[in-house]
């Protein structure tokens, strides 16, 4: 039995399609939205429409932007000889939060995943190779996630880049700050040991 009016039920249904939003959260959001002033609701819906219509991909790095070239790629202060390869635009946000990386990025828009039918041709690997061949690139940092697909993607890209004579590195993985060694899995501990550095 449906306890809601058709319009509320539809709003809940649409909200639950968002990642991380289950039925309960969707219901809570729906009731919050219907209690908002109409002008705020219109502003919210317009912001969603504007973002969808105006956002595109940077023609250089494929990060999301509302201009032809994103702010990072157009920044002359950045080191354009250093490219950090990430899987998704949100990874750029995560890297930028640490405020230590001064190079540029390349967003793959996915990882190689045969189980999900995603091959190398389905993500922005060719574009990365073209960029490296045509640019003055000295180092490519592979910063895909440390899961099976991320590792496979990094290894595949490294194999393609090695013959081009540029330095190819992988971000270190290891024990999280505040983590206990006894609760850390074997693979993470092994990588932490491999990625150790001199003090």
From Swiss-Prot:
This is Recombination protein RecR. Residues 81-176 form the Toprim domain. The keyword Manganese does not apply. May play a role in DNA repair. It seems to be involved in an RecBC-independent recombinational process of DNA repair. It may act with RecF and RecO. The keyword Ion transport does not apply. Keywords: DNA damage, DNA recombination, DNA repair, Metal-binding, Zinc, Zinc-finger. Coiled coil: none annotated. CDD domains: TOPRIM_recR (cd01025). A zinc finger (C4-type) spans 58-73. Belongs to the RecR family. Transmembrane segments: none annotated. It comes from Thermoanaerobacter pseudethanolicus (strain ATCC 33223 / 39E). GO terms for biological process: DNA recombination; DNA repair. GO terms for molecular function: DNA binding; zinc ion binding.
């Amino acid at each position: 039995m449906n306890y809601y009016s058709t319009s509320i039920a539809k709003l809940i249904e649409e909200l639950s399609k968002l990642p991380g939003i289950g039925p309960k959260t969707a219901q809570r959001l729906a009731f919050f939205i219907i209690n908002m002033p109409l002008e705020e609701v219109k502003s919210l819906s317009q912001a969603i429409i504007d973002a969808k219509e105006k956002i595109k991909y940077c023609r250089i790095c494929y990060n999301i932007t509302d201009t032809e070239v994103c702010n990072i790629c157009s920044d002359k202060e950045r080191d354009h000889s250093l490219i950090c390869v990430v899987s998704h635009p949100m990874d750029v946000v995560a890297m930028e939060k640490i405020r230590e990386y001064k190079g540029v990025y390349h967003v793959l828009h996915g990882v190689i995943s045969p189980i999900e039918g995603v091959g190398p041709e389905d993500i922005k690997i060719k574009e990365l190779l073209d960029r490296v061949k045509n640019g003055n690139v000295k180092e490519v940092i592979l910063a895909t996630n440390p899961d099976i697909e991320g590792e496979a993607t990094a290894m595949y890209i490294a194999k393609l880049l090695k013959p081009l004579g540029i330095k190819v590195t992988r971000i270190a993985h290891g024990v999280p700050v505040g983590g206990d060694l006894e609760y850390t899995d074997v693979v993470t501990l092994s990588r932490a040991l491999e990625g150790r550095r001199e003090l």
